[in-house]
Curated annotation (Swiss-Prot):
Binds 2 heme b groups non-covalently. Pfam families: Cytochrom_B_C, Cytochrome_B. GO terms for cellular component: mitochondrial inner membrane; respiratory chain complex III. Heme b b562 binds at H83, H182. This is Cytochrome b. The keyword Transport applies. GO terms for biological process: mitochondrial electron transport, ubiquinol to cytochrome c. The chain crosses the membrane at residues 33-53, 77-98, 113-133, 178-198, 226-246, 288-308, 320-340, 347-367.
Amino acid sequence: MTNIRKTHPLLKIINSSFVDLPAPSSLSSWWNFGSLLAACLAVQILTGLFLAMHYTSDTATAFDSVAHICRDVNYGWILRYLHANGASMFFICLYLHVGRGLYYGSYTYSETWNVGILLLFAVMATAFMGYVLPWGQMSFWGATVITNLLSAIPYIGTDLVQWIWGGFSVDKATLTRFFAFHFLLPFIVSALVMVHLLFLHETGSNNPTGIPSDPDMIPFHPYYTIKDILGFLIMLTALSALVLFSPDLLGDPDNYTPANPLNTPPHIKPEWYFLFAYAILRSIPNKLGGVLALVMSILILAIVPMLHISKQRSMMFRPLSQCLFWLLVAVLLTLTWIGGQPVEYPYVIIGQVASVLYFLIFLVFMPLVSAVENYLLKW
């Protein structure tokens, strides 16, 4: 008798995706982050659902409703901090996942890669709108500054901003629609994840060597399910430590002050995971130029497959490209630090140099170094 998981219409889809899926035998722990992201998304949707049961999206009561969740709702504090710090964990896994894709040349699967970029934009939009909901000082001013960037779009900019605000400033209408979108977007992200997996399973996984692994495949279960469970446990330990010992470590103290349109905080900044893009935005004196640079800082990932001229897929055997990759990581960390600093000397010039370097690495240095490595292969 054939096993039900191989015959049942629904179970056989799950079976072919997570049980009997042929996977390369050489996958390292860098391939854990896909499943960790799925776990993060599940945690965010569950905690978010319970938070939404107690939250009110009205400017008069939003801040108090968050305080009420933390003080009066059973285990409301842990729900709130799991949700807030779960977002940080989500972005850590997301950036490591993208970094792994860049390092090992996974971007050559262009459909999977492009859906991944869409996912990145969708998750960033969700996180931004979620940051506005507690209606603290940084929520309000962050929403004002970031949405106002759209006014840089020629001709339709001002109308577009007022349309998003639902009025002439960030107010009740803005908060209500941001809550609606923040609730809806994770489900759109879940649908995009399915598409991402669909395209991935069309081609099969890449592996650290970048060499086709068809002759050497092993079943996903039990080998990689066990490996993923270990990843879950490590991430859960880190998240629990963050939530239980220093829940406000990654937040902004200004967000514990209720939103006040008459009082601007001394330094407006987004959450830490957007600081690199915020630093790139600030490093360009022109408003439209800054907005374009901000969008391009993420959209540049879509150009990476077109600039891949190396004869080898992975960076595993390309030491020059490896140096460049770690330079890129250093530049990103520098930009993240600069994004959190005030706009003054020497931070401005450091931010500008790092921003130029960021784009140069992608557009000039990577292809150049690949060409040099191709030449060295002839020796």
